UniProtKB/Swiss-Prot annotation:
Entry function: Catalyzes the formation of phosphatidylethanolamine (PtdEtn) from phosphatidylserine (PtdSer).
One Gene Ontology term of the molecular function aspect: phosphatidylserine decarboxylase activity
Name of protein: Phosphatidylserine decarboxylase proenzyme
Upper taxonomic lineage: Bacteria, Bacillati, Actinomycetota, Actinomycetes, Mycobacteriales
Annotated GO CC locations: plasma membrane
NCBIfam families in UniProt: PRK05305.1-3
Length: 240
């Protein structure tokens, strides 16, 4: 006589099962939403509620809420612990590795520095994270165009916000949020004097964009063009 398979894991009849436990499992499986995205998710849910008697309107509202929740997702990340690591400030595909002069508004001179650029598609998480631990010594916003973020000219012509961080050892790393064709809003929550830890969330770009990281002189990129980067985890380079 065949035996009934034993159930693995908690079930509603298990003494250890509770609604709170189920809620924790759901929370661990679904990334939270960045605060900037909550109004968009709320608007979609409000539309679904208002059109609850109309199938297509209800579906449109739920789809919009789900799409916004996905776009503004804020997944947890675990930065590397080895000293000297410079991590990717954004999710996306590495589209450029070259040498370029940092944005003029930062007044860092005309010395070209190693640069790694990441293109963020609509499907990527759009929160930005600190590439290194240190103090924010400059934040500059420069208005500009809203051209396609995957073009080379985007770094110099598009609207951007530049964040300059100085590590405890004196090295400086610059992360530049670059607007794109659909990205019409750059959010930077970091201010001069703030202390950031590697992997801390400091900003967000809506919707589709680019992130340029200027490394200290002498730093060698450890990534390649076309590689996928994970914000706060992928090591772009090491401090020289």
């Amino acid at each position: 006589m065949a035996r009934r398979p034993r159930t693995i894991g908690p079930s509603a009849s298990d003494p250890g099962f509770s609604p709170q436990h189920a809620l924790e499992l759901v929370r661990s499986a679904i990334p939270p939403v960045h605060p900037a995205g909550r109004p968009f998710v709320g608007a979609g849910l409000a539309l679904a509620l208002a059109g609850r008697r109309h199938r297509w309107l209800r579906r449109a509202g739920l789809l919009a809420a789900g799409a916004c929740a996905g776009f503004f997702r804020h997944p947890p990340r675990v930065p590397p612990t080895r000293p000297g690591a410079i991590v990717a400030p954004a999710d996306g595909e590495i589209c450029v590795i070259d040498v370029a002069t940092p944005p003029a508004e930062l007044s860092m001179g005309d010395v070209a520095l190693p640069r790694v650029s990441i293109f963020l598609s609509l499907l990527d998480a759009h929160v930005q994270r600190a590439p290194v631990s240190g103090e924010v010594i400059d934040v500059q916003h420069r208005p500009g165009r809203f051209g396609s973020a995957d073009l080379a000219a985007a770094s110099t012509e598009n609207e951007r916000t530049s964040l300059r961080i100085r590590t405890p050892g004196g090295a400086e790393v610059v992360a530049v949020q670059v607007a794109g064709l659909l990205a019409r809003r750059i959010i930077c929550d970091a201010h001069v004097g703030d202390k950031l830890s590697i992997g801390d969330t400091y900003g967000l770009i809506r919707f589709g964009s680019r992130l340029d990281t200027y490394l200290p002189a002498g730093a060698q990129p450890l990534v390649t063009v076309g590689q996928r980067a994970i914000a706060g985890e992928t090591v772009l380079a090491e401090l020289p």
